[in-house]
């Protein structure tokens, strides 16, 4: 089954078009086969149903993978999901789409949850130690599609932009959609983006935040201030 599901994901990536606006990124809809996606989503429910998420203005997270320190999920659907993401064919087709030549040396992924009212600290390009960033949206039917990752002009400093007024595009927050990009942070060019939940329609925004990392790193010990670890 792993091989069949891997081929499906590979084809979904291959058949999705890269966008250059406002900077290079790749949106892949229906990223996983339905059975695998449904299983993965079900295995996150012990965290998405946490009592702390009944409050507004909360950001919570649960770490599923940090490859170099041997952190992996114990459940079958999530295991298969991450085996697919770590498969060299999958990694190589993503790199090809995003024009990346460097190889990753580590891999990290967490479940990331925002309740209504939460706005990320600031518009940011992502740290330069990240080779590839992937956001995988776990939206429910009827959720607010505007809750996807917001994208901003690459030639401006994020601290000088408004999270809502200066957004030029947002990835669609729809079930099983993915946004992929290669972080860049130079004086002239920044992959500026941000996340927030100011929706009147959707109380809980759910996604995986996944990173292929340039060097080995233990991110399980990072103290993420202002965020609840589940």
Across the structure, where does each feature detected by a protein language model lie?
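A short coil-to-beta-strand element that immediately follows conserved catalytic motifs
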Residues: 99-110
């Amino acid at each position: 089954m792993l091989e069949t599901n891997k081929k499906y994901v590979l084809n979904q990536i291959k058949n999705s078009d890269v966008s250059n606006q406002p900077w290079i990124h790749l949106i892949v809809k229906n990223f996983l086969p339905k059975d695998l996606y449904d299983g993965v989503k079900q295995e996150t429910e012990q965290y998405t149903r946490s009592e702390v998420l009944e409050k507004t203005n909360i950001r919570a997270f649960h770490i599923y993978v940090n490859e170099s320190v041997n952190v992996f999920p114990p459940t079958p659907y999530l295991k298969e999901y991450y085996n697919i993401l770590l498969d060299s064919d999958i990694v190589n087709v993503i790199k090809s789409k995003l024009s990346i030549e460097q190889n990753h040396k580590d891999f990290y992924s967490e479940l990331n949850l925002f309740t209504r009212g939460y706005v990320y600290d600031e518009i940011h390009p992502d740290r330069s130690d990240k080779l590839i960033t992937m956001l995988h949206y776990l939206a429910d039917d009827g959720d607010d599609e505007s809750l996807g990752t917001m994208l901003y002009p690459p030639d401006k400093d994020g601290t000088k932009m408004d999270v809502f007024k200066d957004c030029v595009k947002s990835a669609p927050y729809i079930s099983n959609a993915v946004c992929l990009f290669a972080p860049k942070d130079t004086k002239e060019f920044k992959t500026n983006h941000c996340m927030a939940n100011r929706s009147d329609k959707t109380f809980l925004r759910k996604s995986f935040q996944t990173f292929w990392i340039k060097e080995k790193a233990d991110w399980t010990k990072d103290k993420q201030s202002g965020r609840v670890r589940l």
